Amino acid sequence: MQSLKTPQIEITTLADIPAGTGLGSSGSFTTALLKALYGHRRQHLHQEELAELACHVEIDRLGEPVGKQDQYAAAIGGLTCFTFHRDDRVTAVPLKLSMDTLFDLEDNLLLFFTGYSRSASGILKDQDTKTKGSDEEMLKNLHYVKELGYQSKSALESGNTTAFGELMHTHWLHKKSRSDGMSNPKIDDWYDLAMQNGAIGGKLVGAGGCLLYTSPSPRD
């Protein structure tokens, strides 16, 4: 706000989800706040410009060990494939999905709050340290998960939501192996129970929410 030279204003924020869920709330909040402040000054920012500014605040100014995906997802929206380049550029390409695929996702994606909330910074910092230290296993894991992302894009654009669910399961297994703090026995039990009762795949979202992809069959 100081860099924006905004006149004295009062800001009040309300949220339906608790802090520490890891659902990208900090990136979304920063992006939305910047958009509101620039809008107050009657200045329009392009989506990419807004996302980069939000990244600057969180990563450069606040020193948070986060990536750019949350800010870009908040600024651009929709189902989008993001490519993060070595030179710090970000390319955003909207997925080409049929209406049937969108309806299928709406019907079968369920988000459960596990009751756990924490800061994801510790896990992300550990991951960032290993990556920058050229940890072979971590780099191999990240490259494989990147390929899973491209496979998920192809599955969705071809309308194969079952394959998407299976890829989500594979993604979770690899993500969980990065750190002992990524999951816990209780969450693992809930995940296994869901898989035994019709879920095709799922993953823990950030630090608290559990996203499960269920089969199209009727569920209780």
Residue ranges and their predicted role:
Residues Q2, G39, Q47, E52-P65, ...:
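C-terminal nucleotide
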Residues L211-Y213:
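Structural motif
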Residues M1-L53, I187-W190, M195:
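Anion-binding (especially nucleotide phosphate/pyrophosphate-binding) glycine-rich loop
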